Amino acid sequence: MDIPPLAGRTVAMSLGALPVSYVLNQVSAFSQPLCVVLTSALVLGLLFMAVYSLSHGEITYDPLYAVFVVFSFTSVVDLVIALQEDGYLMGLMDFYAKEGEPYLRTAHGIFICYWDGTVHYLLYLTMAGAIRKRKRYRNLGLYWLGSFAMSLLVFLPGNILGKYSSEIRPTFFLAILYMLVPCWAGMRIFNQSPAPSSCTCDVVQEEQKKSLLQRPADLTLIVYLILAAFFTVFRGLVVLDCPADACFIYIYQYEPYLRDPVAYPKLQMLMYLFYALPFYCLAAYALTFPGCSWLPDWALVFAGAIGQAQFSHMGASMHLRTPFTYRVPEDTWATFLLSNLLFALGPHLLALRCLWRPAFFLRAAPPSSPQDQGKKQQ
């Protein structure tokens, strides 16, 4: 399989975050929040100008190239912050974690940084490499879009509503501008033409004639979607303070992190309740009735969103930065990990199913009329 190479120029620019972080950390003036936000904007502006001057051809071909290069730089910064907060690095991003975005020092913030510095970073390099080679990256872009949007939709409101709301810095308003990026990038990615399907009309018609019992993989996914929907409703009721005994036992013995006043876990469960739950129902419908051509794209977006959300939620639930009373008890680790890993795995299996065997979701060609058949015979 021909995999797009990682863009070497993008790697070099992104790794420039290391010396830049070290130099800025040595300047005492950056102990002021206003200096931090102005410097951050200046660095990103200079980086964008450098990308534009060095890669004008790529940006002309696809403006998202500049976004991926700049964001790869910020991904390295996020990875440095996460490693520094966990004690693996020292003296690189102290000023930003203290005066820029102190909520990145929470357990949830640390795992957002880990995800951005690893998964997002590899996606940026791969998509930038695909643009340089003029190859398709639509599927990777959809996965990134869901992941990036989910992290913002939980993290930014959580900073305002949680116990760290009093520590909002001017840099927070710079982060709000990031919300415009997935909107614009999403429109461009969705407007890209999908890869041409190799399924013939006969294959599509034959696949769509099969009943659900003749498609055991789809039947298994539907059962999973139903169970995941019930689990989503249950955890939504838990964070909404449902007085049922089952909710009380769950929040104290299995996921006490849902009570943490940082607000991120509550917002995450509400995001699941209001957005993931409808998708589970619609996806089960699309696996039952043929021709739902929207599912393959949205399954990728949803897989990215759930992957990022579950990684951050599971990591923060067990991280030492979370107060002991809100951490998962050691005797329930197995149940917690199994249920949450399955919750994260299912959407990825759904996306893979849609990519590998898309015939069931394609719109069947209308049957040819007798006149058309007569013309073909002539």
UniProtKB/Swiss-Prot annotation:
It comes from Rattus norvegicus (Rat). This is Transmembrane 6 superfamily member 2. PANTHER family: TRANSMEMBRANE 6 SUPERFAMILY MEMBER 2, TRANSMEMBRANE SUPERFAMILY 6 MEMBER 1/2. GO terms for molecular function: identical protein binding. CDD domains: TM6SF1-like. The chain crosses the membrane at residues 34-54, 63-83, 110-130, 140-160, 170-190, 219-239, 269-289, 291-311, 332-352. PROSITE patterns: EXPERA (PS51751). It is found in: Endoplasmic reticulum membrane; Endoplasmic reticulum-Golgi intermediate compartment membrane. Keywords: Endoplasmic reticulum, Membrane, Repeat, Transmembrane, Transmembrane helix. It comes from the Eukaryota. GO terms for biological process: lipid homeostasis; regulation of lipid metabolic process. One of its GO terms (cellular component) is endoplasmic reticulum membrane. The keyword Oxidoreductase does not apply. Residues 61-186, 217-351 form the EXPERA domain. Belongs to the TM6SF family. Regulator of liver fat metabolism influencing triglyceride secretion and hepatic lipid droplet content. May function as sterol isomerase. InterPro entries: EXPERA, TM6SF1-like. It is a multi-pass membrane protein. Its main location: endoplasmic reticulum.
